[in-house]
């Protein structure tokens, strides 16, 4: 696992600084990710490899295409894991996806980029939590905001750190809520909860992710 630990780095670098392969505007650097991808692919295990980015906002067409090319050259399935940390550098969310599938989806949709941001415990997520508690019977609701609006166009393995106190953890339900149209739809997914309290699930859609422990029911 490359990258210096926060304890070993100089105090001038904030603990939540983006990784070295992320450019000034928060976009993944096409040149740097190309190098990272080639290195990862050459060290692939069982035909699989992964590149990490931390606190990136977007990954664009050029970066995705560079990853897809590196993967194709060695016939390796290459994933990108985009991690979001809190101010102390602790990972609170991650989005993992196949770089080639993402490159194809972005080209097909003409969107030019995938948005990688994930918000937890912000004004936005608190407003949506209040909205759902006002209109629905569900007592236990956790909300995460993905920067990606609408469909990703490919499967994303998401992990988010949410407080599941009082939730029935054996019966979690996931929904995508589109604030612009004020509509929600269920995300059909299996899920796991790891030792660090991250909830892992799959989604093909972004927007707000609503996690609850019963089917959403109107008051």
Regions found by a protein language model. Give the residues of each.
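Generic detector of short, aliphatic-rich beta-strand segments that form the cores of beta-sheets
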Residues: 1, 153-155, 208-212
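Surface-exposed loop/edge segments in extracytoplasmic proteins
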Residues: 181-189
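C-terminal beta-strand-rich structural cap/linker in extracellular carbohydrate-active enzymes
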Residues: 195-218
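Proteolytic processing hotspots in large secreted/extracellular or virion-associated proteins
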Residues: 27-173, 178, 215
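Short, exposed beta-strand/loop patches in secreted or surface proteins that constitute
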Residues: 20, 40-43, 134, 189-194
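Short beta-strand segments and strand-loop junctions that repeat across beta-rich extracellular domains
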Residues: 173-182, 208-210
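Ser/Thr/Gly/Pro-rich low-complexity, disordered linker/stalk segments of secreted
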Residues: 1-41, 51
């Amino acid at each position: 696992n490359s990258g210096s630990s926060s304890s070993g780095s100089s105090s001038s670098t904030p603990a939540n600084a983006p990784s070295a392969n992320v450019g000034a505007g928060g976009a993944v650097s096409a040149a740097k990710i190309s190098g990272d991808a080639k290195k990862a692919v050459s060290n692939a295990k069982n035909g699989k490899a992964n590149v990490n980015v931390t606190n990136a906002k977007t990954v664009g067409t050029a970066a995705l295409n560079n990853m897809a090319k590196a993967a194709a050259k060695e016939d390796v399935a290459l994933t990108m894991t985009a991690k979001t940390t809190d101010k102390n550098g602790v990972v609170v969310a991650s989005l993992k996806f196949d770089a080639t599938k993402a490159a194809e989806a972005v080209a097909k949709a003409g969107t030019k980029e995938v948005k990688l941001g994930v918000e937890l415990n912000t004004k936005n997520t608190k407003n949506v939590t209040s909205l759902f508690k006002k209109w629905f019977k569900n007592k236990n609701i956790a909300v995460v905001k993905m920067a990606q609006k609408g469909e990703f166009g490919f499967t994303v393995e998401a992990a988010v750190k949410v407080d599941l106190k009082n939730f029935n953890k054996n019966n979690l339900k996931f929904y995508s809520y589109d604030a612009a149209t004020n509509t929600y739809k269920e995300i059909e997914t299996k899920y796991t909860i790891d030792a660090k309290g991250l909830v892992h699930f799959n989604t093909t859609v972004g927007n707000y992710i609503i996690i609850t422990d019963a089917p959403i029911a109107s008051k």
